[in-house]
Amino acid sequence: PGPSSPPRRRARAAWWVGGAVLAVVAVVVVALVVGLSGGGGTPAVEDPPVAAGPPGTEFPPGTVRIVDEEAGISYPFLGNGWFEYDLGLMPETRTVAGQYFTTQEGVPTGGDFIAQCTSGPVADGYGWAGPGSEQATVTALADSVRAAYYPFPNERQVLRDEALTVDGAAAHLVEFQLTWDVEGYESTGERAALVVIDVGRPDPALVYVSIPNTHAELYGVIDRVVADIAVL
């Protein structure tokens, strides 16, 4: 695919226009409830602040985790400046839950460029054949997102390609760095990570984190999210 391919996570997922039925994603958000007595708990780890961008749908005050009931997992809410993902479906998953913020408005191919941390049950067509196929599935998904959501041409450097255990479940992680030099984009690269988890359901869960290098100070959220995924 060349520069005319669909823009990076375009608002409202324009490729689904034309009769596709959007799934209604029920995202259950866990709120931190402060007790009436002795409210001094251990403070949450704070990530670097996110530069102000166009506002999206804010999470309820006190949110600490995002619970994706459809995928069967939960993971950390990354804090102020991250908004509820409401930009439409992605073809890699049956439904989408998660968080994002805009890093550049009006990229050359249309739509906006974003940082995101999203999840969902993996859709058909990505090689899932049950337990033991985590690596094949996440590899196919990594190729899919590279082709669909980033400027071309680009170069990919694989940083990690390894089996994991996530909350007792078999999983596989692929993390990579993309670089490009494409006119009209403020970023010249991106760090992305995908984790496929066998959650004991017909479809495995996908967690997808992607941060443009204009916000490289946030690369650490990848390790934070991967280390704190829970299986429901």
Segments predicted by a language model, with ranges:
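Hydrophobic single-pass membrane-targeting/anchoring helices
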Residues: 1-55
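Solvent-exposed, non-transmembrane segments of extracytoplasmic/periplasmic domains
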Residues: 54-232
